Amino acid sequence: MIKVAEELRIDPWGTSYIKDYNRLMREFGIKPITKELLEELPSVHRLLRRRVIFGHRDLERIIEAIKTDSEYVVMTGIKPSGPFHLGSKLTAEEFIYFLNLFPKAFGYYAIADLEAYADNKIPLEESYKIAIDNLADLLALGLDPKRVYVYRQSEEMRVLRLAFIFSRGVTYNTLEAIYGDKPFGLYFSALVQAGDILAPQLPENGGPKPTIVPVGADQDPHIRLTRDLAQRFHSDFGFILPAATYHLLLRDLTGQEKMSKRNPMGILYLCEDLKLAKKKVFNAFTGGRATAREQRELGGEPDKCVIFRELLTVHFVEDDRKLKELYQECRAGNILCGECKARAWEIISEWLRRHREKKEKTRDLAAQLLQEHTLT
């Protein structure tokens, strides 16, 4: 765990808190996503336009691959510990975006069942079932099963072999300095994740190539460890340092700094019962004033509001002009929070219904994909 005073706490397995993202970027060498960089991309996702994805390491490598008509890899995964929620959706959308950005991109998707066991004590048999459900969500979000290789960490010998090799390149003190005092199983799972990220560059997978890993800011310790290992073992494998993009850590529905299963009212699952989902949305933290009169006179505070920031901006309103209208209406005091929640619920519930319909059609395909790794 990286901890710099109480304003910056980064723990990929625990609670992270980032008050100042500029400080995070200075401390650890993350570059900002600039307007000039966005202009180099063939298309720009709303998460980039709205600065939800705020930083990167070596995104230029991916842009160069596109310009030179070269292949690159998009790598991500999921710890199969429960159903897809909004946080899972965020990373999944980034994965699909970078995959669809260029025809020669190919995806690798790790089912992190070893991490689920090390961190959550979830048996491999149980995580297998959860993984199928997670993959059904991923397919419903638009993943092309012909352009991805899906695997379970526990069964992917190339990844496990790399993790063992990498263990010669780090010491216990190094891992403790990066992650803090953790059970050794979590340290090993970090080496396995490094194997996940670098395995696409092995000779049997086509050799060294640019790789991009979209992550939340709290996962940067894994990226830094992996990039360090890529350098240490460059003479053995010819690894190209993996690129990464970073998205903001979003609050839960109640306004807490990070979603936690210990606060179930703060998490919105994609398969949520609609009655419960509605209750969560209507109880979400807002930027409303103390009274309706104050709201009309002073205007609302959408920059503080979970409904506007975390739900509409990040997830459910694609059109930038529509989003701007909603923002201005709130700031002008022309709408009260109850009305805004009702309108937001119409948008969210429609999305959830459509997603559920798509997901039901992908369950068999998800099981097949996990069994066969890719589809032709």
Language-model features, listed with the residues they occupy:
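Non-catalytic terminal extensions that flank enzyme cores
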Residues: M1-I78, R227-F282, G288-T291, V306-T376
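N-terminal Rossmann-like or analogous alpha/beta NTP/dinucleotide-binding catalytic cores
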Residues: M1-V73, P80-A199, E357, L375
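Structured ligand/cofactor/substrate-binding pocket environments in proteins
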Residues: F84-L90, I96, D113, I122-S127, ...
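Hydrophobic/aromatic-lined pockets within catalytic cores
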Residues: N100-P103, L139, L143, R168, ...
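Short helix-capping/linker segments at secondary-structure and domain boundaries
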Residues: K104, A199-T211, H315-E325
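Residues on a specific face of well-ordered alpha-helices
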Residues: I132, A136, R224-D228, K279
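Short amphipathic alpha-helical segments and their helix-coil junctions
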Residues: K146-R147, F166, V170-Y179, V281-E297, ...
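Short, solvent-exposed polar/charged micro-motifs at secondary-structure junctions
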Residues: R158-F164, L225, T254-E257
